Amino acid sequence: MRVSIIIPVLNDGKQLIQLLDSIQIWREEGHEIILVDGGNDDKSFITTGHLVDKVLKTSPGRATQMNEGARHANNEILFFLHADSILDDNCIFAIIHELQISNNVWGRFDIKLSGTHWMLRIIERMMNIRSRTTGIATGDQGIFVYREIFSQINGYANIELMEDIEISKRLKRISPPVCLDTRIITSSRKWEQKGILKTMMLMWLLRLAFYIGVSPRRLSSIYYSS
């Protein structure tokens, strides 16, 4: 069983190159890496071609980019990964092993925020507990799913924000997620730049607004203007 690693990118620069360097061992084992460009103007992007199996171009938007990557994937399992992630060497093995021994069709990893502030430790713990309790995953937790199942549900909804929450709700009707305690480290840059408490409150409010029916387009406008 093989995995297609799909990475949507938009001006991710140095973080992207660091990620790609770190996962080359997976290519050697027959897994593929697909980079989906949403309109980069970062010159460092052009140096990454030899580190991936496919480079695709599409309009910006994570949902659009990830769906395009899935459409060109060859392997049985799709693994959607953010460009600012840092991964354990055993991540791919863990995905394959847990899907094979269970009846689950999808899953996600626990998350660790990269910064050292003590509040980030509390936030990441709350995020992991919430995800395990609700069966809802966020994109920075590295969502993985059988390609056949992804195709059956028509992939990510083409919405501007909350595409990860939306697809989780549909996937958990089929099965609960595999919740791997192996951690993906994700950048805490946005938390530190915008303020940890401010960012936490914003994320909670956006999620609440999504659940009560505020449109993803409106939420995207609020998120990016903040």
Regions found by a protein language model. Give the residues of each.
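N-proximal low-complexity "stem/linker" segments adjacent to membrane-targeting elements
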Residues: M1-S22
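A conserved acidic beta->alpha catalytic loop
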Residues: D37-F45, S85
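Short aromatic/hydrophobic "clamp" motif used to bind/position activated sugar donors
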Residues: L78
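Conserved donor NDP-sugar-binding/catalytic core segment of glycosyltransferases
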Residues: N90-M119
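Acidic donor-binding loop at a coil-to-helix junction in glycosyltransferase catalytic cores
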Residues: L161-I167
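Hydrophobic helical membrane-anchoring modules
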Residues: K169-S226
